[in-house]
Structure formats: structure tokens, C-alpha cells
Amino acid sequence: MEVNKKQLADIFGASIRTIQNWQEQGMPVLRGGGKGNEVLYDSAAVIKWYAERDAEIENEKLRREVEELRQASEADLQPGTIEYERHRLTRAQADAQELKNARDSAEVVETAFCTFVLSRIAGEIASILDGLPLSVQRRFPELENRHVDFLKRDIIKAMNKAAALDELIPGLLSEYIEQSG
């Protein structure tokens, strides 16, 4: 939705000056600006920018907290003390936020999602392969049955591999982690 500076300020409950400051900080402008031209914004793009900016600010705060705690020297922290527990909590929060950001930006995805997608694609491929011998037989009627049967056998092997993909992924993931780690 296109909005002007005043409408955007109302949406965020902020002043027009704040909107101007955000614009200087990189908030996306749809069009306009310059001498005498009203600036228009795409509200969805601005909300996305604001959320990303807010997450970056929060990450920076957590990073600073972690760094302050590290400077306090991890060796000096005694298990069971408030400082030690605060250090563990802050580090866990920072790690969780970084993982969430990586997931939100699609830098990482869950294994279950990959298994789901690959299994669905494998099923579609198996369906196409299943009709291939009949298509070849119709297209080339001069082929003997032994040729078509040979084709069917190899296609069945490929279909079985595709069908077992969802069972193979966890093992392949473990193998990948072992080799890359």
C-alpha cells in the first residue's frame, strides 16, 4: 500500500521527524522526494525494513552483552553464580537470534523441510518415469518387447531409489556432517 510520510508516521505511531531519520538510515522510498515532491512509501517494504533493522539492533545489543561478559573473562566465571548463568543465557540468546535470522533469510533450512521437498520431487519424478515405457512403446512401435522390458527394469530401479529418498536423507546428512566437520 502506498503511503505518504504522515500516513507512515501514523502507522508506526512515530513523528514525521522520526520517519525522516529512518529515511536517512536507509528506509526504502517508493518514489518522490526532491524539491516540492511528496515522498511515497510502500508500507510492506517499510515494515520489512523496520523489522530487519529492529532485529539487527537487537543482535548488536546481544553481541555487546556477550562481548562484555567475555571481557569479564570466562575463566573468572564460577558455575552457579549469577554472572555465570547470565553469561550462558546471553550467549544462548545470541546464538538463537543468529540462527533465527539465518532461517528467516533462508541461509539455513530445517532437515524436515528438505526431506519433505525432496520426497515430493522424487514422487513426481517417479510418476513421470512410470509412464515412460508406455510412451516409448507408443512412439516406437517397432521396438520389441524385450527392449521395452529392459527399459522398464531400469526405470523401476530408479523409481525405487526415488521412493526411498526420504529414508536416505538422515543418513546422508550424518555422512555430510562427519565429512565436513
Swiss-Prot record:
GO terms for cellular component: host cell cytoplasm; viral terminase, small subunit. Homodimer. Heterotrimer of two small and one large terminase subunits. The catalytically competent terminase is composed of a tetramer of heterotrimers. The tetramer forms a ring structure large enough to encircle duplex DNA. Host IHFA/IHFB induces bending of viral DNA to facilitate the assembly of the terminase tetramer of heterotrimers. Interacts (via C-terminus) with the terminase large subunit (via N-terminus). Its EC number is 3.6.4.-. One of its GO terms (biological process) is viral DNA genome packaging. SUPFAM superfamilies: Putative DNA-binding domain. The N-terminus contains a winged helix-turn-helix (wHTH) that binds the viral DNA. In the homodimer, the wHTH motifs are positioned on opposite sites of loop and probably bind to separate R elements in the cos site. The N-terminus also contains an ATPase site that regulates DNA binding activity. The central part contains a region for the self-interaction. the C-terminus contains region of interaction with the terminase large subunit. Pfam families: Phage_Nu1 (PF07471). It is found in: Host cytoplasm. Keywords: ATP-binding, Coiled coil, DNA-binding, Host cytoplasm, Hydrolase, Nucleotide-binding, Viral genome packaging, Viral release from host cell. This is Terminase small subunit. It comes from Escherichia phage lambda. It catalyses: ATP + H2O = ADP + phosphate + H(+). Belongs to the terminase small subunit family. Residues 141-180 are annotated as: Binding to terminase large subunit. ATP binds at residues 31-36. GO terms for molecular function: ATP binding; ATP hydrolysis activity; sequence-specific DNA binding, bending.
